[in-house]
């Protein structure tokens, strides 16, 4: 079956460490607009921002992008994009849903396209990205999620686990998980219907819910890591990069 993708970008107004970060100005534009523009450059599907606040919706539409307002009480971006999908596409035209985080203003079109590639294997439920860790301090940083997987090729893994700990043990490279997901529609439907799993709650990583329910996640390895914006320090770094 041919892949018919749609890109959904979740963006909520609330953020504990950096309030209203989706609207933070970077090089003359709000952060969420930078993400939408990069997604548009990937040029393979419809792009919609899914938000919980009218202020974000107004900004997104003012820049010519499509937006939908969702409920405010979603616990994850996956839940938010699923609600958006049910409103946008009741006819089920789209069979692949690409979840591009709204706080990745330095993401590239190449990385977005790469996230789809593992779905070329019909056995893969969910595809995501990773990159080799090159900074020594990141190996022990709990904010850097590591991938434990079995190699399928030189640039692809089947994920066995994700962790904030330093793993796997021993000699060899470690890989940084990049939180972009391409779901088969049926996989997203299954995922959001599941209750949070024990390991998900312990590690605070929602992708573990899928693994604990025997869903297959394959990881495409890319060369660069887009900088996520979670703090004011992150925001200042991104402003320098995109200045």
From Swiss-Prot:
GO cellular component, one term: cytosol
GO biological process: CMP-keto-3-deoxy-D-manno-octulosonic acid biosynthetic process; lipopolysaccharide biosynthetic process
UniProt enzyme class: transferase
UniProt catalytic activity: 3-deoxy-alpha-D-manno-oct-2-ulosonate + CTP = CMP-3-deoxy-beta-D-manno-octulosonate + diphosphate
Record-linked Pfam families: CTP_transf_3
Pathways per UniProt: Nucleotide-sugar biosynthesis; CMP-3-deoxy-D-manno-octulosonate biosynthesis; CMP-3-deoxy-D-manno-octulosonate from 3-deoxy-D-manno-octulosonate and CTP: step 1/1; Bacterial outer membrane biogenesis; lipopolysaccharide biosynthesis
Keywords: Cytoplasm, Lipopolysaccharide biosynthesis, Nucleotidyltransferase, Transferase
Highest taxon listed in the record's lineage: Bacteria
Main location: cytoplasm
InterPro entries (UniProt xref): Cytidylyl_trans, KdsB, Nucleotide-diphossugar_trans
Entry-linked SUPFAM superfamilies: Nucleotide-diphospho-sugar transferases
EC number: 2.7.7.38
Cellular location(s): Cytoplasm
Gene3D superfamilies on file: Spore Coat Polysaccharide Biosynthesis Protein SpsA, Chain A
GO molecular function per UniProt: 3-deoxy-manno-octulosonate cytidylyltransferase activity
Similarity annotation: Belongs to the KdsB family.
PANTHER family xref list: 3-DEOXY-MANNO-OCTULOSONATE CYTIDYLYLTRANSFERASE, 3-DEOXY-MANNO-OCTULOSONATE CYTIDYLYLTRANSFERASE, MITOCHONDRIAL
Biological role: Activates KDO (a required 8-carbon sugar) for incorporation into bacterial lipopolysaccharide in Gram-negative bacteria.
Protein name: 3-deoxy-manno-octulosonate cytidylyltransferase
Annotated source species: Bartonella henselae (strain ATCC 49882 / DSM 28221 / CCUG 30454 / Houston 1) (Rochalimaea henselae)
């Amino acid at each position: 079956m041919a892949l018919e993708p749609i890109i959904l970008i979740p963006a909520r107004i609330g953020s504990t460490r950096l309030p209203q970060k989706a609207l933070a100005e970077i090089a003359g534009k709000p952060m969420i607009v930078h993400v939408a523009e990069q997604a548009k450059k990937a040029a393979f599907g419809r792009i919609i921002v899914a938000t919980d606040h009218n202020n974000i919706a107004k900004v997104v539409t003012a820049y010519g992008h499509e937006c939908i307002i969702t409920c405010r009480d979603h616990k994850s971006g996956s839940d938010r994009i699923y609600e958006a999908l049910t409103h946008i596409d009741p006819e089920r035209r789209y069979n692949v849903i690409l979840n591009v985080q709204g706080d990745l203003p330095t993401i590239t079109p190449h990385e977005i396209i790469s996230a789809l590639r593992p779905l070329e294997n019909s056995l893969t439920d969910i595809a995501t990205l990773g990159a080799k860790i090159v900074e020594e301090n990141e190996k022990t940083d709990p904010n850097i999620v590591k991938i434990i997987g079995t190699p399928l090729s030189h640039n692809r893994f089947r994920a066995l686990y994700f962790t904030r700990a330093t793993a796997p043990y021993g000699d060899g490279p470690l890989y940084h998980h990049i939180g972009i997901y391409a779901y088969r529609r049926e996989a997203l439907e299954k995922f959001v219907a599941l209750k949070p799993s024990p390991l998900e709650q312990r590690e605070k990583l929602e992708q573990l819910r899928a693994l604990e329910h025997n869903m297959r996640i394959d990881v495409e390895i890319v060369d660069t890591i887009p900088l996520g914006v979670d703090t004011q320090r992150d925001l200042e770094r991104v402003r320098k990069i995109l200045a």
